[in-house]
Each structure stands twice: as C-alpha cells, then as structure tokens.
Amino acid sequence: MSNDNRFIDNGDGTVTDTEKGLMWNKTDSMNDLKKWVNYQDSADYARSLNEKKMAGHDNWRLPTRDELSTIYDESWAIKDRFGKDIHIHECFAPGGGFSMIAEQVSGRMRTWVFNIRTGEYDQPDGLWTLAESARAVRTIPKVDDEK
C-alpha cells in the first residue's frame, strides 16, 4: 500500500490509518478545547468523545506510546496553532497542538509525550502539571484483515 493511500479522511471528523488499523480523531484537544491539557484533562477529553459517540463510536482512548509516532512523518507538514510545521498527514486538521499525550505508563504516575514537530519522545514529571495536547484514537480491523 502506498503511503499516499494510508490515511483516509472519513468525512465524519475521523481519519483512518489503514496500515496500522487505527482510527484517529481528526482534531486534537487544542483544536476542540482551545487550551493545553494535563493528563486528567486528556483522559476526560477521550471520555467526552465516548459520551458523544463521536462518529458513532464509544471506544475512544488515549494512544499508547508506540501509537503516538505512527502518524508522524518528517516529509509531511501542516501548521500547528502557532503557524509552525507539525509533521502529520494533511488529513488531520491544522491549528492543533505540537505535542500529544499517551496513555499512562502502567503502574507509574507518568506518561509519554510525543512532539510532532521534532519526532521526539519525552517523559516529563507530573501528570497534572503537563501542558500538552491530546488526540484520541480507537483500534479498528486493518484493511488487509477484512479480506
């Protein structure tokens, strides 16, 4: 599958990654809430999408550490809230944050943050003092799995 066809804008506020079997919210918390979020806010953001049944689904969650980097490609660029390049596919909405929060590290009071300007991970101290953005995701069958 060519990289050009990997991400599909579903026209319902979601983007499907056909290679990884993931459906992403097209916007992030910065687009939707107009503010930075801490870990609790990001979990609440995903929960609110479930309560609204965003795009007809109620299994939205924060991405894992590994899932965070799957939407990053240095050759792609759209503008973040500050007019700087973030390296995600053009199917995603511009104007969002430049970092994404992952789900909490199991058994620890920490999380991963992925910078979509630089492609680098960080594991900052303090779940409740973070100031990042969140993007929700859900797992779907891969296109190849449906055949």
Where are these regions (language model features)?
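Extracellular adhesion/carbohydrate-recognition regions
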Residues: M1-A55, W60, A131-V137, D144
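Residue-identity detector for threonine
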Residues: T14-T18, T27, T64, T70, ...
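Short, surface-exposed beta-strand-loop junctions and turns on beta-sheet-rich folds
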Residues: M30-D32, I78, E120
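An exposed tryptophan-centered "aromatic clamp" motif
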Residues: A43, R47-H57, R65-R117
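Disulfide-stabilized, aromatic/cysteine-rich ligand-recognition loop
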Residues: N115-K147
